[in-house]
Regions:
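Catalytic loop of short-chain dehydrogenase/reductase
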Residues: 13-22, 93-132, 136-177, 189-191, ...
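A glycine/serine/threonine-rich, flexible loop-to-helix segment
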Residues: 177, 189-213, 253-255
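Short coil/turn segments at alpha/beta junctions that flank glycine-rich nucleotide-binding fingerprints
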Residues: 31, 81, 133-137, 177-180, ...
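Hydrophobic structural elements of the Rossmann-like NAD(P)H-binding subdomain
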Residues: 11, 89, 141, 182-185, ...
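Canonical Rossmann dinucleotide-binding motif of NAD(H)/NADP(H)-dependent dehydrogenases/reductases
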Residues: 2-37
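C-terminal helical subdomain
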Residues: 121, 184, 203-239, 244-248
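Conserved mid-core segment of classical short-chain dehydrogenase/reductases
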Residues: 55, 61-72, 76-81, 87-113, ...
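Aromatic pocket-lining residues of Rossmann-like dinucleotide-binding sites
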Residues: 28, 175, 231
Length: 255
């Protein structure tokens, strides 16, 4: 019996086989989940292609969090397909180039606003889309990167992750009475398409494995996927508002 047998789960953020969201989707499917994916903008066709590597008939919905109407459309499409939904993965993040790479003091508000809406507010948008169908409770899990410290080059995306963490706590508060949990997985660096677009990402690669007491491989997304699938399952019924660090222990170490 799989951890997610009989579960219906919406997965955002699948672009390529290297995506963390793909690793989660693949493992969730192997653990028995029925899936729907979402994609957005120019990446939608890429998501559709990658979805075929999971299943030939996997539905892919358009969900651009910059468009309010997409939230309503996703909710309607899910209601047409399923009478309930059990879980959702938030793997949505983006920042314009000007918001990354050591340009913190010069980034204009318009670019910050785009990063904030796509990377943080989108968790609320996802909740709006899925919670009407979480009639028997459910689990929302988001991918995070530790926002307790300032990282080289991460800049406004780090601020967005701090906002994401706070958003998750408030969703946990307001959705808890409906038995809907909201948690984040703060992953160590994994070599994905998104990660490679962050200036200085290789600095994380160089030091993480040496400092993490359990070690760390930037080429192993499955350790992150396992945590996400566990949180999507029924095995954490009393856990919400949590940030689960899956980073080899790096976050707990001093200099």
């Amino acid at each position: 019996v799989g951890l997610l047998d009989g579960k219906r789960v919406l997965i955002t953020g699948v672009l390529t086989k290297d995506s963390l969201a793909f690793a989660v989707a693949d493992l969730a499917q192997r653990e028995g989940a029925e899936l729907v994916l979402t994609g957005a903008g120019r990446g939608l066709s890429l998501t559709q292609r990658t979805a075929r590597k999971l299943s030939a008939d996997l539905d892919v919905l358009e969900f651009d969090v910059m468009e309010d109407r997409h939230t309503e459309a996703v909710a309607a499409a899910l209601a047409d397909k399923w009478d309930r939904i059990d879980g959702a993965l938030h793997a949505i993040a983006f920042a314009p180039e000007t918001a990354l790479g050591g340009n913190f003091l010069n980034t204009q508000w318009d670019d910050i606003a785009v990063a904030m809406r796509i990377s943080a507010w989108s968790l609320r948008a996802l909740a709006d889309a899925v919670t009407p169908l979480m009639t028997e409770g459910g689990s929302i899990v988001g991918l995070d990167f530790d926002a307790q410290v300032a990282w080289p080059g991460y800049d406004w995306m780090g601020v967005c992750k701090a906002a994401l963490e706070s958003t998750s706590r408030y969703l946990a508060r307001d959705l808890g009475p409906r038995n809907i949990r909201c948690n984040l997985v703060a992953a160590g660096p994994v070599r994905t398409l998104a990660a490679r677009s962050i200036p200085g990402f290789e600095l994380f690669e160089d030091v993480w494995d040496g400092r993490a007491p359990l070690g760390w491989s930037v080429r192993d997304p499955e350790v992150v996927a396992k945590a996400c699938v566990a949180l999507l399952s029924d095995w954490f019924p009393a856990t919400t508002g949590e940030i689960l660090h899956v980073d080899g222990g790096y976050h707990a170490m001093g200099v």
